């Protein structure tokens, strides 16, 4: 009878001596579908014929079978038969196509399985250790980034504090310079009495001691600032903050604050002392002015009694005519001066326009350089993206090869994992390099914006100072011209009065009769003298105001010079920082040359960027040199103005002396008033002639006023044209700045896009890693399932061995089984 396959779990009953089993197996003792089938038939009609058995009554025996994977179909195979008269054994062996080799006892050994398990465990341990190492490295990188960020923030805070302290020191130094100037002024005033001199010496000693204390405090504060700068520079080079560094920084900060507080206290005391001295000096000056005024009033009263009325009337008429002629001359001079000033203004505006055009061209060149750098950054990012794509493709290829290698052999899995780790390391290095490049770009951009702002502020300050200097120069010229006119008028008066002196002697007898009306004229002349004195006082006040304005301009020029010195210091600091950063970058690039041999183009681009930055620094140095030259010119102009003011003082003193001489001559003329009465008739005729001349002069004045109006209109039109040109240049500069800002925004958007693309690439890389890990876990699960099936098949083989031993317990059956069975080489010895 033929063996039949069953889908359920087979069962074996207790077998006796005549029990027979049939077995179907594959390479690893598997049936094609389900459990092996064994049938035993018995008959009492036939006898034994050799080794064959024919049994009518059949019994189906089922055995327990391990779990088999689904997806395979059952099939019937041709079996082998051994017949005997009472029994028949039928075995269905597997087909030759499916069974490649014959099963042996060596195949049933578990050494290969144990070695495979050991290898799998080793691989699992290696994978776990590598994953742990990667996680540790990531955590360390995150910690280092956090520490660097904290250190950067700390350094930035310290820098801000240092800048504030430096600003305060600059203010205190400016105050010290003001105090020194005040002390020098105090030294120059030596017209005090002995008691006042002693008191002043004591006050000077106090002030000098306080100044020395303030300078000592300032020097100590400057030393503390330098120490803080040195510590911060060391921290920049070390890039790691320790507890000792933090303690030293806090100590130095406390010392600096203490010394600054002492410095402020000394400054306050100095200010109080100087205020007291100024108050005393003002009170003394007021007392002196009161005394001089009283003396002048007494002199005026004496002059009132001496002067006569007729002489004052004649002087009035003559002076009015002279004033009208002088007004005409002054108007002509003002018209010529206005034309000259308009020409100078045109030249100045043209020079300013040329300067602005040159600045616009420079800005255009800078914007072009920025565009080039942006394009270079784009090329770098594109190259990095291409490299990332190539690495992705390589990773995909490597993953496919890894899949094939895992199916074929397990040793290729190690190589693929190592290669994947190398790729992860390379990707991390490239991400770090991209982040560093972006950070350097942002730092350069911020520094460029700061330098542009500082440059604009300095240019505006220089323009304001130039305008003030021109205004002061114009005012000084007008003052000088007025003084010259006054002096010329006084000289002309002297000549005329000397000429009239001889005539007054003859007229003295005639004027005795008309003495009463002449007294009225004398009073009027006295009033005119008072007016002249008031005008002299006004001129003195104007000169004092101009002196104060010149001092203000000098102080402003000193402030601009201090600001330029600060700019020079900041540029030097930027140079030092740039050199340090360049050296650090060179060291980093030299250390990374072994790892970055595949990226020489990027290094060349970075070197080109460094060269461009150095060129920009050289340009900024040239600009600073130009600004220093401009400041030196301004200082020379201010000194020239001071010389002019001194000349004006001397002229004013000379005019005062001349006024004294005139007063003496007026006294002499008072004595000679008696001789002027005879010349009244002649003067009346002369007055009629002069009235006609005055009428003609008025006509000329009207014509000149018309000409002045036309000139004023031309001036207004020229000024409006200049303003329009300036507004046009401003609009052009604003449009260029807007275009530059739009380009910068475009570059920033491109950078953000590259950042998002890098984030997407990182996400895809993480997804690929997760998929790879999930596939590895699936393979592990499959290996475990195969191991479980191997164990179950081994148990099944042992069970079959035991069943064969029980079935073929008799000698003839066992011998016949051993001689004719194809599994005899696999059966255990009896």
Curated annotation (Swiss-Prot):
Testis-specific (at protein level). Expressed in spermatids at tubular stage V of the spermatogenic cycle. Highly expressed in the cytoplasm of elongating spermatids (tubular stages X/XI). In step 14/15 spermatids of tubular stage III/IV low expression detected. No expression detected in other testicular cells as well as the early round of spermatids. Residues 144-217, 245-423, 461-798 form a coiled coil. Tyrosine phosphorylated. Phosphorylated on Ser-95 by TSSK4. The keyword Ubl conjugation applies. The keyword Coiled coil applies. The modification Phosphoserine is found at residues 73-74, 95, 106, 109, 115, 129, 139, 261, 632. Disruption phenotype: Null mutations in F9 embryonic carcinoma cells eliminated distal/subdistal appendages and prevented primary cilium formation. Loss of ODF2 also disrupted two mother centriole-specific NIN dots, while leaving one dot on the proximal end of mother and daughter centrioles. It is found in: Cytoplasm, Cytoskeleton, Microtubule organizing center, Centrosome; Cell projection, Cilium; Cytoplasm, Cytoskeleton, Microtubule organizing center, Centrosome, Centriole; Cytoplasm, Cytoskeleton, Spindle pole. Its main location: cytoplasm. GO terms for cellular component: centriole; centrosome; ciliary basal body; ciliary transition fiber; cilium; cytoplasm; intracellular membrane-bounded organelle; microtubule. There is a cross-link at residue 138 (Glycyl lysine isopeptide (Lys-Gly) (interchain with G-Cter in SUMO2)). Keywords: Cell projection, Cilium, Coiled coil, Cytoplasm, Cytoskeleton, Developmental protein, Differentiation, Flagellum, Isopeptide bond, Microtubule, Phosphoprotein, Spermatogenesis, Ubl conjugation. InterPro entries: Odf2-rel. Belongs to the ODF2 family. Self-associates. Associates with microtubules and forms a fibrillar structure partially linked to the microtubule network. Interacts via its C-terminus with PLK1. Interacts with ODF1. Interacts with MARK4; the interaction is required for localization of ODF2 to centrioles. Interacts with TSSK4. Interacts with AKNA. Interacts with CFAP58. Interacts with BBOF1. Interacts with CCDC38. Interacts with CCDC42. Seems to be a major component of sperm tail outer dense fibers (ODF). ODFs are filamentous structures located on the outside of the axoneme in the midpiece and principal piece of the mammalian sperm tail and may help to maintain the passive elastic structures and elastic recoil of the sperm tail. May have a modulating influence on sperm motility. Functions as a general scaffold protein that is specifically localized at the distal/subdistal appendages of mother centrioles. Component of the centrosome matrix required for the localization of PLK1 and NIN to the centrosomes. This is Outer dense fiber protein 2. It comes from Mus musculus. The gene is Odf2.
């Amino acid at each position: 009878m033929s063996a039949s396959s069953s889908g359920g779990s087979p069962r074996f009953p207790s077998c006796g001596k005549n029990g027979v089993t049939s077995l179907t197996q594959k390479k690893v003792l598997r049936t094609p579908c389900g459990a092996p089938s064994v049938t035993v038939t018995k008959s009492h009609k036939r006898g034994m014929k050799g080794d064959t058995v024919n049994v009518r009554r059949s019994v189906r025996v089922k055995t327990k079978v391990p779990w088999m994977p689904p997806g395979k179909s059952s099939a019937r195979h041709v079996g082998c038969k051994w017949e005997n008269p009472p029994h028949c054994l039928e075995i269905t062996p597997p087909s030759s196509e499916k069974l490649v080799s014959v099963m042996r006892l060596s195949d049933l050994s578990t050494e290969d399985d144990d070695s495979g398990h050991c290898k799998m465990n080793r691989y699992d341990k290696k994978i776990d250790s590598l994953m742990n190492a990667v996680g540790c490295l990531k955590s360390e990188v995150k910690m280092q980034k956090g520490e660097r960020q904290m250190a950067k923030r700390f350094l930035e805070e310290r820098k801000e504090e240092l800048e504030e302290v430096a600003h305060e020191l600059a203010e205190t130094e400016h105050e010290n310079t003001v105090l020194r100037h005040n002390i020098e002024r105090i030294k120059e005033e030596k017209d005090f009495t002995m008691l006042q001199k002693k008191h002043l010496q004591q006050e000077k000693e106090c002030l000098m001691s306080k100044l020395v204390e303030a300078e000592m405090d300032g020097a100590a504060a400057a030393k503390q600032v330098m120490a803080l700068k040195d510590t911060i520079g060391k921290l920049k080079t070390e890039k790691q903050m320790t507890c000792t560094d933090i303690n030293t920084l806090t100590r130095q900060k406390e010392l600096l604050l203490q010394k600054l507080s002492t410095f402020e206290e000394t400054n306050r005391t100095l200010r109080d002392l100087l205020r007291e001295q100024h108050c005393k000096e003002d009170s003394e000056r007021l007392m002196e002015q009161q005394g001089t005024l009283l003396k002048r009033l007494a002199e005026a009263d004496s002059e009132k009694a001496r002067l006569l009325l007729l002489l004052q009337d004649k002087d009035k008429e003559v002076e009015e005519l002279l004033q009208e002629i002088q007004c005409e001359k002054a108007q002509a001079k003002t018209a010529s001066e206005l034309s000259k000033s308009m020409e100078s203004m045109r030249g100045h505006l043209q020079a300013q326009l040329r300067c602005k055009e040159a600045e616009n061209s420079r800005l255009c060149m800078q914007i072009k350089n920025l565009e080039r750098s942006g394009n270079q950054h784009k090329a770098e990012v594109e190259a990095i993206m291409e490299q990332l794509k190539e690495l992705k493709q390589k990773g995909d290829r490597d993953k496919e090869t890894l899949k094939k290698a895992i199916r074929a052999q397990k040793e290729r899995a190690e190589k693929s994992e190592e290669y994947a780790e190398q790729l992860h390391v390379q990707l991390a290095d490239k991400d770090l390099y991209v982040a560093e490049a972006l950070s350097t770009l942002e730092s350069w951009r911020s520094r460029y914006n700061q330098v542009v702002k500082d440059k604009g502020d300095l240019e505006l300050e220089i323009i304001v100072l130039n305008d003030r200097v021109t205004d002061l120069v114009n005012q000084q010229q007008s003052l000088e011209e007025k003084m010259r006119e006054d002096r010329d008028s006084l000289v002309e008066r002297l000549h005329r009065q000397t000429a009239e002196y001889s005539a007054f002697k003859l007229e003295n007898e005639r004027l005795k009769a008309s003495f009463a009306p002449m007294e009225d004229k004398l009073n009027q002349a006295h009033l005119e003298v008072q007016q002249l004195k008031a005008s002299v006082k006004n001129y003195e006040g104007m000169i004092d105001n101009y002196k104060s304005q010149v001092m203000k301009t000098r102080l402003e020029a000193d402030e601009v010079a201090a600001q330029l010195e600060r700019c020079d210091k900041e540029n030097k600091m930027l140079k030092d920082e740039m050199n340090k950063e360049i050296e650090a970058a060179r060291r980093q690039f030299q250390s990374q040359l072994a790892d970055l041999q595949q990226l020489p183009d990027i290094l060349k681009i970075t070197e080109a960027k460094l060269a461009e930055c150095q060129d920009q620094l050289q340009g900024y140095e040239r600009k600073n040199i130009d600004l220093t030259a401009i400041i030196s010119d301004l200082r020379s102009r201010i000194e020239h103005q001071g010389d002019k003011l001194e000349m004006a003082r001397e002229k004013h003193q000379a005019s005062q002396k001349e006024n004294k001489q005139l007063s003496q001559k007026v006294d002499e003329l008072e004595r000679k008033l008696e001789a002027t009465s005879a010349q009244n008739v002649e003067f009346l005729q002369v007055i009629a002639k002069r009235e006609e001349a005055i009428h003609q002069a008025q006509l000329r004045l009207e014509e000149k006023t018309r000409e002045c109006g036309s000139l004023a209109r031309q001036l207004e039109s020229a000024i409006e044209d200049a303003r329009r040109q300036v507004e046009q240049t401003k609009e052009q500069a604003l449009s260029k700045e807007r275009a530059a800002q739009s380009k910068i925004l475009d570059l920033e958007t491109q950078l953000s896009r590259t950042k998002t693309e890098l984030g997407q690439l990182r996400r895809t890389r993480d997804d690929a890693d997760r998929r790879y890990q999930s596939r590895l876990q699936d393979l592990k699960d499959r290996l475990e399932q195969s191991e479980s099936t191997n164990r179950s098949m081994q148990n099944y083989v042992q069970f079959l061995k035991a069943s064969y031993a029980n079935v073929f317990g008799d000698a003839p059956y066992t011998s016949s089984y051993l001689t004719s069975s194809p599994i005899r080489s696999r059966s255990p010895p009896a």
